[in-house]
C-alpha cells in the first residue's frame, strides 16, 4: 500500500486510534484486503470548471484507486463517501458497472455537443481491477461508436490491451494517451506508487502505442522537489527514445489529508530526505 495509515475523515465526529504503535505488517495486510462496492451513480460525466486543465468533462469508471499513489490529490474525495483518504482510498473501491450505458445515454441526448472527455480525473481508469471488469474498454467502445474525442492518462501498462480500439479512435483523430512517469527508479516507484506498472513497463507501453499510430506522450507527474526532480532530464530522454510525442509536468499538490499522509510516508520510507523535501 502507499498510505501508511488511515487519516481521520474530516466529516466524521468520531476517530479511533489504535492502541499499538507499530502494528504487525503481515497482520495489517491481511486486515486490509481490497473491497469493491457497486456505485449507483445515475450520471457519468463530471463537469470541470477549472482553467488549469484542457477538458470540460471527465469520466471516472471507479472511485478510489488501488494503485496506492501516496501523493494522489484525489484522496480527499473519498471522505465525501464516508471513508478515509488514507488506506480506505486504496482498499475500498467503488465500481461504476453501468458507466458504458450511462455514457451512451449521455451521448444520445440531443443537447450533447461532442467535445473532449478525460479518462480519468480522480482515479486511474486502468487500475488492476479493470483487467477483469473491462469497464474502461467498454467506455472506449462507446466513444468510438459516437465518434466523441477522448483523452486518457494512466500509470498502467494495461492500456495496451485496448490498442485495437485506440487505433480506430486515432485513425479518426479522436484520442490522445498520456502515461505518467514519476521516476525511472523501481525502488522509488515501488513504495511511492506501489501497485502501478513499473517505469520500464510504462515506457514499453509508450512504444507500443506509438508504433500503433496512437498519439502518446508522458507526464512527469507529480514533480516532487528533493525527491524526483533531478531525474527529469533522464525521464525526458527515455520517453523520447520510447516514442513519446510530448511531455508535460505537474507539481505535487498536497490538499487536505494528503499532506499528513505524504509526510508520514516520507518519514517511513525516505527519512534521510524528509527534511529536504519538506523545505523545498
Task: Please provide the spans of the model-predicted regions.
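Conserved Radical SAM active-site core
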Residues: 27-62, 70-178, 182-189, 199-206, ...
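Conserved strand-turn element in the central/C-terminal portion of the radical SAM core barrel
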Residues: 184, 192-195, 208-229, 252-254
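Residue-level detector of anion-binding/catalytic polar loops
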Residues: 149, 215, 245
Amino acid at each position: 500500500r502507499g498510505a501508511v495509515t488511515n487519516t481521520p475523515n474530516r466529516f466524521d465526529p468520531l476517530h479511533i486510534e489504535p492502541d499499538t504503535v507499530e502494528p504487525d505488517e503481515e497482520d495489517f495486510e491481511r486486515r486490509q484486503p481490497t473491497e469493491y462496492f457497486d456505485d449507483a451513480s445515475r450520471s457519468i460525466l463530471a463537469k470541470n470548471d477549472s482553467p488549469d486543465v484542457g477538458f470540460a468533462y471527465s469520466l471516472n469508471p471507479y472511485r478510489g484507486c488501488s494503485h496506492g499513489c501516496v501523493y494522489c490529490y484525489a484522496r480527499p474525495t473519498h471522505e465525501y463517501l464516508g471513508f478515509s483518504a488514507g488506506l480506505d482510498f486504496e482498499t475500498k473501491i467503488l465500481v461504476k458497472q453501468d458507466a458504458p450505458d450511462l455514457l451512451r445515454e449521455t451521448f444520445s441526448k440531443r443537447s450533447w455537443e461532442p467535445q473532449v472527455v478525460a479518462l480519468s480525473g480522480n482515479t486511474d481508469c486502468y487500475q488492476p481491477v479493470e483487467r477483469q471488469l473491462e469497464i474502461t474498454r467498454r467506455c472506449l467502445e462507446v466513444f468510438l461508436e459516437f465518434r466523441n474525442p477522448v483523452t486518457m492518462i494512466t500509470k498502467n501498462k494495461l492500456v495496451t490491451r485496448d490498442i485495437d480500439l485506440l487505433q480506430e479512435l486515432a485513425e479518426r483523430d479522436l484520442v490522445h494517451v498520456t502515461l505518467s512517469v514519476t521516476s525511472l527508479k523501481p525502488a522509488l516507484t515501488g513504495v511511492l506508487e506501489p501497485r502501478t506498472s513499473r517505469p520500464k513497463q510504462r515506457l514499453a507501453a509508450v512504444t507500443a502505442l506509438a508504433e500503433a499510430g496512437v498519439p502518446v506522450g508522458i507526464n512527469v507527474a507529480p514533480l516532487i522537489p528533493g525527491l524526483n526532480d533531478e531525474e527529469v532530464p533522464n525521464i525526458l530522454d527515455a520517453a523520447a527514445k520510447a516514442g513519446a510525442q510530448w511531455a508535460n509536468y505537474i507539481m505535487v499538490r498536497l490538499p487536505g489529508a494528503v499532506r499528513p499522509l505524504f509526510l508520514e510516508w516520507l518519514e517511513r520510507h525516505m527519512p534521510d530526505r524528509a527534511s529536504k523535501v519538506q523545505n523545498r
